[in-house]
Each structure stands twice: as C-alpha cells, then as structure tokens.
Amino acid sequence: MRLTFALCLLSLFQIRCVGKTTQCKIETTLGIIEVELYPEKAPNTVANFLKYVDAGLYANSSFFRACTPENEAERDIRIEVIQGGDLPIEKEMDPVAIETTEQTELLHKDGTLSMARDTPNSATCSFFICIGEQPSLDFGGARNPDRQGFAAFGQVTKGMDVVKKIQGQEEDDQYLIEPIKILNITRID
C-alpha cells in the first residue's frame, strides 16, 4: 500500500516536471493540423507566433509554398517544407530576436514548426512545417548562407497527412497555384 502511494506521488511529481507546452490548431481547407509549441525552450519565437494567433491575424491567410524533391532538384541544399502565414505587410508586426536551434536544441525534424526569415532576426509572421529530417535548416546548416539556421519552436502532433496533402498541391516554382487557405489558427485549451 505504501509502495503504491509512493508510486502515485512520484507519477504526479513527474507530470508536474514535464515542460509546459502550448497547443494550437491550424484549420485549413484541407483539414486540421494540431501543433504544440515550446515556450520554455523558445520563448521569444513562441511569443512572436502567438501574437499573430491571439490577434486573429492568421485567419484567411494561406499555405502558399511547398518545397518538394522535384522542385528543389536544381538546388545544392534541398529541403521539404510547406510555408504559410502570408500576411499583407501592414499586418506584419516588428520582428523580434528569435532563438536559434543552437540555443533551443529543437531540431528540424519531421513535423517541426519553424519561423521563416531572410536575415537573422527578421522573422515576422511566415512559418513553415518540415516534412522529414531537415538538418540544413538547423544552426550551422547550409540552407541559409549566414548559417544561423531557422527558429524551430513547435511540433505537429496531429495532421501530418494534411501537411503532406498541402505539399502535394500543384505548384509553379514552389509557389502553390491555388494557395491552401488557413481558416484560422487558435489556441487549444
């Protein structure tokens, strides 16, 4: 009996020690993608993404780009991702200093949610989801010449089939001919 009680207490303690995550739902015209965000590992990047979520700014945006083995064939460093969150420039908020994968230890694996960017700390609203392992997007990776990598901050927990459906849409030079509408992105309680 004491052993059972001790094991129950230990289980409760372990549950409380697990890092806190934030859950979000990405509703698209092709289905729902659920993600968990890691604010304890990537606080600035998660806060940046949630500013857009909480303001409802992703409603009626889209997934507009899909990188595939076929349309990346000419590049030296190939990736497989879908990119979304295209907003009019007037709705973009100021970029913030975001964490690299060297700082967070969150790597670009299958289903990783990450912020798109041009130069370091230029990420605003655009994000992408990895299909398969994408080490060239991590800190030190060669996809971006500055080798700073991209800011991974979450993981798909449900809906990778939807991610792959989006990736499979007809495209022209990586840009979807008919972008897939993001109906909304909301937090899941």
What is each stretch, according to the model?
Residues 15-189:
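Cyclophilin-like peptidyl-prolyl cis-trans isomerases
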Residues 1-4, 27:
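Intrinsically disordered, low-complexity Ser/Thr/Pro-rich tracts
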